Amino acid sequence: MTYLISILIPTLIERKDEYNTMMKGLYEQIKKHDLKDKVEIISICDDRSISLCEKRNMMQKLSSGKYFVHLDDDDEFSCDYCEKIIDHIQRIPVFHKDEPDIIGYNQLAKVSGGRFIVKPHLDATLRLTPCGNQIDPDGKIKEGIIPEFYRYPWQYCLFHQRFKTVYRTESDSPSPDKPHMFDDLNWLKKVQLEHPKKMSYIDFIGHTYNFDDPSKTTTQ
C-alpha cells in the first residue's frame, strides 16, 4: 500500500507516557476522518541502544508514503493536522503541474515565555529572518504583535519520497548534554544539496515547538 504521508516518530522506553499521548491524538484524527489508508505511522522505541540519527534513517527507509515527516514524541500538532495535510495533498494536481518537493506549514514557537511564528520558505536561510514590518526604529520587535519569521523548511515539514535516501550522520556537538543538537541542521543542509525547487504552502499552524519548560524535552 502506498500512503500519502508517513509520520516518523522516534521514542524511548522511558518516554512511553509522552509517546502514548501523542499517538492517541494522531489515531483519533485518523479514525475521525477515515484516513487509515492515507496516513502511515512508523515508530522506533529503544533503550538508547540505537542513536537518534540511526533511528530516523531506519524509519525513512521503511516509509512508503508519498511524503514523510519527522516528529518527536513531545511535539504538539493541531487537532486537524492529518485532515489538513491529506486534503492539501489530494488537491495538489489542481494548483501544481508537478508534485512539490516539500509541503510546508507554520510553526508556533514558545520559548521562555515568548511567542513567535515560523513560516517556511525555500528562499530563506536556515536562520530565522523577520518577515514584514515588525521591527521598530530601535531594532526591537514592535509591542502587541506575535512576530513572524521566515526559515528554510524544517524537519516538521513534509518532504517528498525522493529525499528518503538523504540520510543523517552523527555530528559533533559543543554541548555534552545535547549530543544531537546539530543532527537535524546537518540533514537539512544535505537536503539543500538536492536542490528542492518547489514547495507547496499550507497557511495554518500545524506544529508547536514548546520550549517554555526545557525539562519536558528530551535528547534521545
How should each PLM-predicted stretch be described?
Residues I103-H121:
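Short beta-strand-to-loop element that shapes/binds the nucleotide-sugar donor at the catalytic cleft/hinge
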Residues H180-W187:
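Acidic donor-binding loop at a coil-to-helix junction in glycosyltransferase catalytic cores
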Residues I9-I30:
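Short, well-formed alpha-helical segments that are part of the catalytic scaffolds
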Residues D75-H88:
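Acidic donor-binding/catalytic loop of UDP-sugar-dependent glycosyltransferases
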Residues I92-L108:
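A short, conserved acidic/glycine-rich loop-to-beta-strand motif
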Residues D47-S63:
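Glycine-rich, basic loop-to-helix element that forms the pyrophosphate-binding segment
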Residues F68:
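Short aromatic/hydrophobic "clamp" motif used to bind/position activated sugar donors
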Residues K110-F116, I202-Q220:
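Active-site donor/metal-binding and catalytic loop motifs
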